UniProtKB/Swiss-Prot annotation:
<dbReference type="GO" id="GO:0009231">
    <property type="term" value="P:riboflavin biosynthetic process"/>
</dbReference>
<dbReference type="GO" id="GO:0009349">
    <property type="term" value="C:riboflavin synthase complex"/>
</dbReference>
<comment type="similarity">
    <text>Belongs to the DMRL synthase family.</text>
</comment>
<feature type="active site" description="Proton donor">
    <location>
        <position position="89"/>
    </location>
</feature>
<comment type="function">
    <text>Catalyzes the formation of 6,7-dimethyl-8-ribityllumazine by condensation of 5-amino-6-(D-ribitylamino)uracil with 3,4-dihydroxy-2-butanone 4-phosphate. This is the penultimate step in the biosynthesis of riboflavin.</text>
</comment>
<dbReference type="InterPro" id="IPR034964">
    <property type="entry name" value="LS"/>
</dbReference>
<feature type="binding site">
    <location>
        <begin position="81"/>
        <end position="83"/>
    </location>
    <ligand>
        <name>5-amino-6-(D-ribitylamino)uracil</name>
    </ligand>
</feature>
<keyword id="KW-0808">Transferase</keyword>
<dbReference type="InterPro" id="IPR036467">
    <property type="entry name" value="LS/RS_sf"/>
</dbReference>
<feature type="binding site">
    <location>
        <position position="114"/>
    </location>
    <ligand>
        <name>5-amino-6-(D-ribitylamino)uracil</name>
    </ligand>
</feature>
<dbReference type="GO" id="GO:0005829">
    <property type="term" value="C:cytosol"/>
</dbReference>
<feature type="binding site">
    <location>
        <position position="23"/>
    </location>
    <ligand>
        <name>5-amino-6-(D-ribitylamino)uracil</name>
    </ligand>
</feature>
<keyword id="KW-0686">Riboflavin biosynthesis</keyword>
<feature type="binding site">
    <location>
        <begin position="57"/>
        <end position="59"/>
    </location>
    <ligand>
        <name>5-amino-6-(D-ribitylamino)uracil</name>
    </ligand>
</feature>
<comment type="pathway">
    <text>Cofactor biosynthesis; riboflavin biosynthesis; riboflavin from 2-hydroxy-3-oxobutyl phosphate and 5-amino-6-(D-ribitylamino)uracil: step 1/2.</text>
</comment>
<comment type="subunit">
    <text>Forms an icosahedral capsid composed of 60 subunits, arranged as a dodecamer of pentamers.</text>
</comment>
<dbReference type="InterPro" id="IPR002180">
    <property type="entry name" value="LS/RS"/>
</dbReference>
């Protein structure tokens, strides 16, 4: 059986867009740093990285869709943090963000890595943004690198 899978390689011409929420910026900024650092460490030139900020995670899908449709990137990395509050609001934001980002990926054919934290507490968010549980932004960047390579293999 022939196996095709993406590798963690940076193709010198690959472009990456990080679309990140400003809400919960103390957390999201760490996710951005983790994603950008990972891409740089894998050889992606600075001029091939673009950061696009949106007000909150609910707005991520539209910006992701526009970036993907415009052909501005070979992969998009969605970054945000949805933290439970005193109401059910976070559930609706998280669900619509997840669904919208997935629809943007499927509709555009451009890989979108999901680095949006959906957590119960600020402490959990901090853990997933670079302390005990690693950096989910960095993990999303690794997924994006692999998917760009895989998409190019599948097109060949």
């Amino acid at each position: 059986m022939q196996v095709t899978e993406g590798q963690l390689v940076a193709l010198q011409d690959a472009r990456f867009a990080l679309v990140a929420a400003r809400f919960n910026d103390l957390i999201v900024d760490r996710l951005i740093d983790g994603a950008a650092d990972t891409l740089r460490r894998h050889g992606v030139p600075e001029e091939h990285l673009e950061l696009i900020r949106v007000p909150g995670s609910f707005e991520l899908p539209l910006a992701v869709q526009r970036v993907a449709d415009a052909g501005r990137a070979d992969a998009v990395i969605a970054l945000g943090a949805v933290i439970r509050g005193g109401t059910d609001h976070h559930q609706y934001v998280a669900a619509e963000c997840t669904k919208g980002v997935a629809q943007a990926m499927m509709g555009s054919g451009v890989p979108v890595s999901y680095g949006v934290l959906t957590v119960e507490t600020v402490e959990q968010a901090i853990e997933r943004a670079g302390t005990k549980a690693g950096n989910k932004g960095a993990e999303a960047a690794l997924s994006a690198l692999e998917m760009v390579d895989l998409m190019r293999q599948l097109e060949a």
